[in-house]
Amino acid sequence: MSWQQYVDQHLVATQCVTMAAICGLDGSIWAKSNGLELSQDEVATLARSFSKDEVLAANGIRIGGTKYIYLSGDDKLIRGKKDRQGVHIVKTKTAMVMALYAEPILPEQCAVVVEKLGDWLIQNDL
């Protein structure tokens, strides 16, 4: 299965994710939803930001030029929100699974889908 199929079939097709991407920890973009504008700089900055609460709280989370308010996170997870939209990012051994959602999707719905794929990737050393 290609990375694009993971984005399309395991994230967006669930209807619990509006747009998604899978990116390398080096900032490379492996697959993304149509219409999701990402820069390698944004992705690389996010990859370096896990477990840096003070940096994320001060600077927010930038995806596609949009700044999201940092809500919470740890060494494998980052959560953010802006108005009626949000972002949920899971770090695996080699990648980040990044998902955006908008109302009426609930943050918890997005989280379950993203974390399930993230857990599967971790179990498979990806």
From Swiss-Prot:
Q: Which family does it belong to?
A: Belongs to the profilin family.
Which SMART domains does the annotation name?
Answer: PROF
The task this protein performs is described as: Binds to actin and affects the structure of the cytoskeleton. At high concentrations, profilin prevents the polymerization of actin, whereas it enhances it at low concentrations. By binding to PIP2, it inhibits the formation of IP3 and DG.
**Which GO cellular component terms, listed alphabetically, does the Swiss-Prot or TrEMBL entry include?**
cell cortex; cytoskeleton
UniProt superkingdom: Eukaryota
User: What is the native source organism of this protein?
Assistant: Branchiostoma belcheri
Q: What is one Gene Ontology biological process annotated in the Swiss-Prot or TrEMBL record?
A: regulation of cellular component organization
Q: What InterPro entries does the entry give? A: PFN, PFN_euk, PFN_sf, Profilin_CS
Cite the record's note on assembly. Occurs in many kinds of cells as a complex with monomeric actin in a 1:1 ratio.
Q: Which UniProt keywords apply?
A: Actin-binding, Cytoplasm, Cytoskeleton
Indicate yes or no for the key word Cytoplasm. Answer: yes
UniProt-listed SUPFAM superfamilies:
Profilin (actin-binding protein)
Its localization reads: Cytoplasm, Cytoskeleton
Q: Does the keyword Cytoplasm apply?
A: yes
GO molecular function terms noted in the UniProt entry: actin monomer binding
First-listed, main subcellular location of the protein, grouped into a coarse class: cytoplasm
> Would you tell me the protein name for this molecule?
Profilin
